[in-house]
């Protein structure tokens, strides 16, 4: 669908409430973006629930992301975006914990994506890795795999033995039930 995230087109003008009503009523691949826009123009969570019939819990989760987007953008407009600014480092980390990509941050902060990546690396804002418990804690997994996150901590256990890296593409994802 050509989106880089929930706020896929940060510079676009927001539609009117009337335009959004039509976009919100019918489930489709673009409705999530209309929900974001509706939140930005002032629809309440109750209104969105009535129109979309989406559970309020999910709407609150989306609202948290939309609110964080605003905080990230506003911070960049009012503050120095340099690695020696501890507040900027905290906002950058929080943005990554919320799942904002370097490309999204570049769009919001009107900077090249490479500058965001360099800033992130310079401030130590890098992903960590957590183990996917494929055996439901019943026994030790001998072929563990990991997912990346920006949460604190790291569960990777390095060993002094030969290693194999499997690169692949396609529809395989965590939770699909395909074990390697």
Kindly label every feature range from the protein language model:
Residues 1-180:
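ATP-dependent carboxylate/acyl-activation modules
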């Amino acid at each position: 669908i050509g989106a880089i995230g929930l706020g896929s087109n940060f510079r676009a003008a927001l539609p009117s409430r009337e335009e959004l009503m039509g976009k919100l009523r019918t489930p489709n691949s673009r409705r999530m973006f209309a929900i974001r826009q509706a939140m930005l123009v002032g629809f309440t969570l109750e209104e969105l629930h009535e129109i979309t019939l989406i559970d309020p819990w999910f709407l609150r989760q989306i609202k948290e992301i939309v609110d964080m987007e605003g905080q990230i953008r506003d911070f960049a407009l009012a503050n120095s975006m340099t690695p020696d600014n501890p507040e900027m480092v905290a906002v950058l980390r929080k943005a990554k914990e919320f799942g904002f990509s370097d490309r999204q941050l570049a769009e919001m902060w009107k900077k090249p994506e490479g500058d965001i990546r360099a800033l992130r690396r310079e401030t130590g804002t890098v992903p960590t890795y957590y183990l996917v418990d494929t055996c439901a804690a019943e026994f030790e997994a001998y072929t563990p795999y990991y997912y990346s996150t920006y949460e604190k901590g790291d569960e990777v256990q390095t060993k002094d033995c030969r290693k194999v890296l499997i690169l692949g593409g396609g529809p395989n994802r965590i939770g699909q039930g395909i074990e390697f």
